[in-house]
């Protein structure tokens, strides 16, 4: 495989926050260096179900992760497995649930917090965090600076064809403070600046890049339901290909086949939604 793509998941960022607070991302759109669409998540718009849908291309009622209490190995074809089947190298810098969904479960911290498994059929290079002890007061989230540096290190050291970064910082901020507040303004600005620091380097390394979220949140910081604020996110695309009209509403289930299409990996029959990039 000679193509490369990175998926950056900023957990819990609603569409409105992307478009009003991420000035660096929006500046790239204005300059023509990126494109942006609105994307709607599956329901329930909870983290676990959305993670599984992002990588399998099917709704929770099919893949079986119906809530954040259903953490198990998903038994359907997924992005990691398809990239590996096509000869690509995969990496993940994410919450530990991604490892449980797509490599092995249950997550054993000493064994699974960090691994390099060149022969794995799914994730070759994993760097994970559990957020154990998380509550309303203590977010237990790792520094985004460390996550971004770690993904870049994996790209340089192992030549990833597909890599994913997932950060829960803004999701946790939203649960604690809501969205109409100075804390959220500042948090979005910091992550936007982090993207500005790393994204040009990824592009220079030959990566196409997707920046998006798994789900949104209500103004009070809730998600899981059906409201547009809880489901709708922005998707920014840094790469080639023909995309849909700017006003098109993307389906989250089309993300997995789109990633595979860009990488030249086979799209399994279980992924029934057409790629939105040609």
What is each of the regions a protein language model found here?
Residues 1-278:
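Feature captures the catalytic ectodomains and active-site-proximal regions of enzymes
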């Amino acid at each position: 495989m000679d193509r490369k793509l990175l998926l950056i998941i900023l957990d819990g960022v609603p569409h409105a926050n992307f478009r009003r607070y991420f000035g660096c991302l929006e500046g790239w759109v204005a300059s023509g260096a990126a494109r942006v669409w609105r994307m709607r998540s599956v329901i329930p718009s909870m983290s676990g179900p959305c993670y599984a849908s992002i990588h399998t291309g099917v709704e929770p009622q099919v893949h079986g992760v119906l809530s954040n209490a259903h953490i198990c190995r998903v038994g359907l074809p997924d992005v990691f497995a398809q990239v590996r089947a096509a000869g690509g190298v995969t990496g993940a810098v994410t919450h530990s649930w991604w490892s449980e969904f797509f490599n092995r479960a249950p997550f054993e911290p000493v064994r699974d917090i960090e691994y390099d498994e060149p022969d794995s059929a799914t994730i070759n290079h994993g760097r994970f965090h559990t957020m154990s002890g998380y509550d309303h007061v203590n977010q237990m989230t790792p520094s985004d600076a460390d996550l971004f540096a770690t993904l870049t290190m994996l790209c340089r050291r192992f030549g990833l064809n597909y890599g994913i970064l997932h950060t829960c910082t803004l999701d946790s901020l939203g649960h604690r403070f809501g969205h109409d507040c100075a804390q959220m303004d500042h948090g979005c600005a910091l992550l936007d600046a982090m993207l500005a620091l790393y994204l040009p380097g990824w592009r220079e390394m030959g990566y196409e890049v997707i920046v998006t979220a798994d789900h949104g949140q209500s103004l009070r910081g809730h998600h899981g339901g059906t409201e547009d604020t809880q489901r709708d996110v922005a998707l920014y695309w840094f790469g080639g290909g023909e995309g849909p009209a700017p006003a098109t509403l993307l389906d989250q289930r089309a993300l997995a086949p789109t990633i595979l299409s860009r990488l030249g990996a086979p799209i399994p029959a279980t992924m029934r939604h057409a790629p939105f990039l040609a």
